[in-house]
């Protein structure tokens, strides 16, 4: 009965949803493209071979989280096709940049019975893996009716989401019974799922697969090549995955730092592509000498900022930097993954708003493997300056964070072990 009301409400809201997509397309015209896929219509698109793996990652962050899993699945099960779905154009671009034609990519339809029915008929998977937090009752129900396992991998549940689901806890039990496995990334999320009524015998704490980063030889070669072209013996700090309200703070800090370190270079990488031009306009307004990564222009001695407006190159940007600030943390967005810069033993600075990754930041703070600052330009400037002035501090901070990364590896293998029965079953 609850799913009936949920579906009815979703149908009633379709005009509002379409208006919302229209508003999004004003800032990012890509939202207007492939609209039919949102309703399970695929036209002349090639359909994947049946009995493959269907993986859903809502946007860029989830795609990044899924990357080591997909790479390993491609290696271990090369005979199984992989269908990758996202919701956002940025997620779509990240899939294409990372995997090219080695996976099939579509937008996941809205969670309407007829749309989901068409999608499942089109893909015909043997297993559905959803990354991190996505719960779609009609998708789960229709997969269950077809005996297709539904797994939430690297699952996390924020306090806010747990509170919202808690209001309808009594109505969740049928949906919980249709989910084959939840592999939680930390104890906090695991306890929240259990509190909401998910059966403990189907709940596993595997750890966060984001710890299983791989800085492969190809990436290291690209880093060496770009470092030769860009660094020119200049110190570089990166402000990565920044959100609205953070760039102004970062640029004010950088302006003050340039007065003391005239050859300091900032790599400024906004989280979302639709903000690339907005940040470029801000750089012009603030009269910084900058270049855009997308133009392949090389920095000269006058370049103060490089705007990272390319897709799929964040690890490359981290690799050539000396100090990293991880964004989404000076504003109440919840922060982003600090493990990527730590893979290079790089000192990491973050704001105080890191509630998206409570377990990771708790461990890093305990071992002094991250430097937390208040949401002011002065605080950020002092943190960067302290690290620029002390190689010992940079190494101590970077090494402490790197040890946390290494000690927590293995989540990917634990997840793969849990997935193996579903992947190898005969249908």
From Swiss-Prot:
Pathway listed: Bacterial outer membrane biogenesis; LPS core biosynthesis
Gene: waaA
Entries under Gene3D superfamilies matching the protein: 3-Deoxy-D-manno-octulosonic-acid transferase, N-terminal domain (3.40.50.11720), Glycogen Phosphorylase B (3.40.50.2000)
NCBIfam families: PRK05749.1-4
Positions bound to CMP: 270-271, 311-313, 337-340
Gene Ontology MF annotations: Kdo transferase activity; transferase activity
pH relationship of activity: Optimum pH is 7.5.
Protein name: 3-deoxy-D-manno-octulosonic acid transferase
GO biological process entries: lipid A biosynthetic process; lipopolysaccharide core region biosynthetic process
Purpose of the protein: Involved in lipopolysaccharide (LPS) biosynthesis. Catalyzes the transfer of a single 3-deoxy-D-manno-octulosonate (Kdo) residue from CMP-Kdo to lipid IV(A), the tetraacyldisaccharide-1,4'-bisphosphate precursor of lipid A. Is strictly monofunctional, i.e. is capable of adding only a single Kdo residue to the acceptor lipid.
Residues under site feature: Transition state stabilizer: 132, 210
Family: Belongs to the glycosyltransferase group 1 family. Glycosyltransferase 30 subfamily.
Residues at the catalytic site: 62
